[in-house]
Amino acid sequence: MPTTLYRFILAIALLLPMAAFAGDAEDFVAANPVQQAKLLETWAAQPDPTRIELINALQKGELTIDGQAKTLRLNNRLRGLIDTAMASHQLLAADAKIRLSAAQQLQKSAKPAQLKFLDQQLAGENDESVHAALSLALANLQLVDTDPAVRLAAVRLLGETGDPLARTRLEGLLEPGVEADANVRTAAETSLAQVKRKLLIGEMLGQAFSGMSLGSILLLAALGLAITFGLLGVINMAHGEMLMLGAYSTYVVQLMFQRYAPQAIEFYPLIALPVAFFVTAAIGMALERTVIRHLYGRPLETLLATWGISLMLIQLVRLLFGAQNVEVANPAWLSGGIQVLPNLVLPYNRIVIIAFALFVVVLTWLLLNKTRLGLNVRAVTQNRNMAACCGVPTGRVDMLAFGLGSGIAGLGGVALSQIGNVGPDLGQSYIIDSFLVVVLGGVGQLAGSVLAAFGLGIANKILEPQIGAVLGKILILALIILFIQKRPQGLFALKGRVID
């Protein structure tokens, strides 16, 4: 008998949530849009874990009417209320990340009816980040409280956040005729100034970080150019196309993974790195052997020849892949970012690119300073004739150095494919900036290239919002011209006796 009773109670316990789900669903389907909105507001103010499946079905548009094949039709207002109700229910989740996301959603959409529930959740919340997010959501609602002391506390809390939404709320509170209490208005003005100051700091840091990521691409492009230009004195106008070929090599590797190893698609950028390096290095060495070697000492002919080669490479890519941009997707481990400030997110792909660029710089320095090839390159750079007299195969060194520079540019193309569009004209956007980096940093100087690349990248990103991209580039170019007139050797000059 006890066993039978236990089974009966267990069956009732299992059926109760299903009955509640069915009852809420029937009430919602039977109601008109106005009544449905009231139901959603009630559910948001009084969350019930048994109702989350119903709200999830509504959110995904999977709730159908009995006897009909079509799904329930919802207007935009109802969809917004469904999102708010879902956020309220997700505050009951055990996962702190889910609660944090829900609290951030409620900062934008919470209704006054949810005030009591949010207050209860805030009192029992142990996670610091979720607690802070809930405090902000609660403060947004308390701005319309009848008690001036509550409004004053809410205004002061908003001033500590530095959130863009807080600025909007405070600006609304300071509209004529909105807030009658003088103390609250004064506190709102102070808090608004604090929020604007914090937002400005976040914007400046964001621009600096974007500049560093742009500088990383310029560094990878200019690093190879510094080697070839510093060693051979060749103005290679096709160097930007090595970036483009590296990006298209990444695209081809992605296609191969999609077709033959879709289960390992997340790792395609790691395979694309050596592929892009060897493809562009081989093309660079072939270019040096067939064209540039016969034009040494004739800079104008070299410039025109490499410019023509760049046009040929662009047209070849258009014939093979089409004139439109191709899609290179970020793997999951390069998607998303780190939330540093309310208005500052550092994307993972840009963080990885900056670290990768610095890693390539270290490898290049080791190659040039700790290997026999590097010794030969530095010898030929300082005095080609004397190096040849000492037995250094200058022709072979020229070819390998040109291939190394082109390969590094190919690595830059892999990095660029993760943050920008990949198209036939990709390299044209970076060739001028790459030459500016080389000239500003000092021909053949790695340290100068690093400083110049990051400096130009950050300056570009800071000036763009202020005076526009075109005027920003003009101003930077003018400043570089003035600098070169005063210091023609750039930031760092080559040490030793260099023969021009």
Task: Name these PLM-found stretches.
Residues 263-309, 316, 451-456, 487:
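Alpha-helical transmembrane segments within multi-pass membrane transporters and channels
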Residues 239-286, 466:
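Membrane-embedded helix boundary and interhelical linker motif in transport proteins
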Residues 22-164, 168, 172-204:
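Extended repeat-based scaffolds of very large eukaryotic assembly and lipid-transport proteins
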Residues 345-422:
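Helix-loop-helix "hairpin" substructures at the membrane interface of multi-pass membrane proteins
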Residues 295, 301, 305, 325-327, ...:
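Cytosolic-side transmembrane-helix boundaries in multi-pass membrane proteins
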